A protein has these predicted regions:
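Domain-scale signature associated with acetyltransferase and cell-envelope carbohydrate enzymes
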Residues: 1-73, 77-83, 89-92, 100, ...
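Conserved coupling/switch loop of ABC ATPases
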Residues: 94, 112
């Protein structure tokens, strides 16, 4: 987290419009974006029921984060805790919390909560390793 975020600024978010970093938020008034977050290009966030992205979270490109599902009607806030990492092309479904310092591998489908300090991946994402706290 050194030089990469040296000049970090809160992005300008307009409803259903791409940010200058090429990601988009629907229902942006329900998005809480932490300090020094990194959201990859072509990521889609639907924050209708709340999305919280805490400090130092990194989200890869082409991810989708949903707080509502029109297919099964499931709704619920999504929380990405401090220093969580979401690999590119991953999907997070409604009501999920990804714990602090956890890492989600690329192309994963996160349907259930992931505890802090874990590595998880797959369809559906499963914890494969617990990380040692430093």
């Amino acid at each position: 987290m050194t030089e990469r975020f040296k000049n970090w600024k809160y992005p300008i978010i307009k409803e259903r419009k791409m940010t200058k970093y090429n990601w988009v938020v629907q229902n942006s008034k329900h998005l809480k974006l932490g300090y020094k977050t990194d959201i990859g290009a072509f990521t889609y966030i639907n924050a209708k029921n709340g999305v919280v992205i805490e400090d130092h979270v990194q989200i890869g490109s082409h991810c989708s984060i949903y707080s509502i599902s029109t297919i099964d009607g499931k709704e619920g806030p999504v929380v990405l805790k401090k220093n969580a990492h979401l690999g590119s092309h991953s999907i997070v479904l409604p009501g999920v919390t990804i714990g602090e310092n956890s890492i989600i591998g690329a192309f994963s489908l996160v349907k259930k909560n992931i505890p802090a300090n874990c590595i998880a991946f797959g369809i559906p994402a499963k914890v494969i390793k617990r990380l040692k706290r430093q």
